[in-house]
Amino acid sequence: MLLKKNEIVEIEITGMTAEGSGVGRVEGIAVFVPGAAAGDRLKVRILKTAKTYAFGKIEEILEPSPERIESDCPCSEQCGGCAFRHITYAEELRAKENRVRDAIERIGGLQNPDIHPIVGAEHADGYRNKAQIPIGQDKQGNLIAGFYANHSHRIVQCDCCALQPKPFEQALDAFLEWARKSGESAYDETTHKGKLRHLYLRMAEGTGEVMVCMVVNGNGLKGEDSLAALLRERVDGLKSVLINSNREDTNVVLGRRFRTVWGQDFLTDRMCGLQFRISPLSFYQVNHAQAQRLYALAGEYAGLTGKETVLDLYCGTGTIGLSMAGRAGRVIGVEAVAQAVENARENAALNNIENAEFLCMDAAEAAQLLVQRGEHPDVVVLDPPRKGCAPELIRTVADMAPSRIVYVSCDPATLARDLKLFRELGYAAGLITPVDLFPRTKHVETVVCLSRKNPDDRIEIDLDLDELDITSAESKATYEEIKDYILKNYNLKVSSLYISQVKRKLGLEVGTNYNLPKSENTQVPQCPPEKETAITEALKHFSMVPFK
């Protein structure tokens, strides 16, 4: 059956895509429907067809999903920012966790990956500490501001974004009031004329400090001082008013030159018990509360004892590496953005951290240089951009032979691709935890602990079967079989690390497993009591420990 354009079909939505669309099937053909929720029964108009799939739009909701909710944002159907505002947050978290699992299994080729439950956010709104708001004009020529529609550069007017904090709304209101009176025109991407391009906003949630930056097609604005005065009057926590000059005929938001109109040219934030200086171009996670949870998890996976050398690649302003410095012997951070490296060094000095150094280099080049210098880090932290790591970088990191690699990813697909190459080079993914840094949007972060794997993933046991009176089949329970038994009978997920810990506690032999620590002093997650009980019972079931 080939669906036709404008055909109306009845469909039940059975899943969600990474983009937040619902997906169902009609006669074996997958139909993708934006704004649909898993469990919806819909009438859908077909908009575009192919041999094995089609795209449609909702004509009528025949029976809503229990997870469907009314969007609380008037712009959500047009704006390309929020992909999940039409479903409950619990359902959104399930969709994101499934997305991570699907990528790691399908692209990465991992069977039964040890994926822990996603770390959700306490607050799904008002969390963003950075915004880039395009300025344009409507059909009547009036100045407007908002966000781009999905997959386009058409501005959807939106004066109040639910994801942003109150000071950003205050800044936008004040800026538009000033701009409409000033007579300044909006930049036109087609003609490359007009002055006002973007309003760029940053906030340090830990201190409440706010930065407002006007991105202009030129060197400045007429009446800058009056704008700064209005912003100072209206914006809570304002510390910085800047002009960014961007004369390029491009859709890149920021130009290379910044000028301070009022205040300072940086913000100071508090995170993970430390202070961080943030410049306009510095990479800094956009969700303060969830970033702290993410970094705590990365530190836990690093298993530091106070002696290790940590190599922090793509370090930005040094947040991850500096958060680990108090538990490491030495930290080496690498970042390609010069201003971010300068901030990282300032941040180390600001916090009296003397065991950290920062290099301004490409990550792959820096890794090769460190190999040539004979550096052998114990732990490597990777926090690459969305495109993931280059193959040559992965090979260089593997050549360094660190005991652990902590990979922080913002894209499940490129993460899965990189995990596959790491596995080929002798590193296997152990603990995997998704973290929702971007509630209501399609994005999700993931933290992975990799360590050198044993070529044979089965438990290594050398037992006399006759003496123990068990069958050959009973003696060959793999870690995955133990995990499956516990999940089926106790509804608990356990890691290979926890199984190894319980086996050792029971006096059983444990082979060289990739989840085991390299030394007795290495700090690793400890098995919770309820999981220890379940593992013990599973080992009894497989006759690997005597019944008592």
Task: Map each language-model feature to its residues.
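Terminal RNA-binding accessory module
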Residues: 1-75, 357, 364-365
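Flexible loop/N-cap segments at domain edges
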Residues: 199
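Short, charged amphipathic recognition helices of the HTH superfamily
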Residues: 471-484, 495-496, 510
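Extended interfacial segments that mediate partner engagement and assembly in macromolecular machines
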Residues: 59-71, 77-186, 205, 221
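Short Lys/Arg-enriched helix C-cap and helix-to-coil transition segments
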Residues: 510-520
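DNA-recognition alpha helix
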Residues: 478-490, 500-506
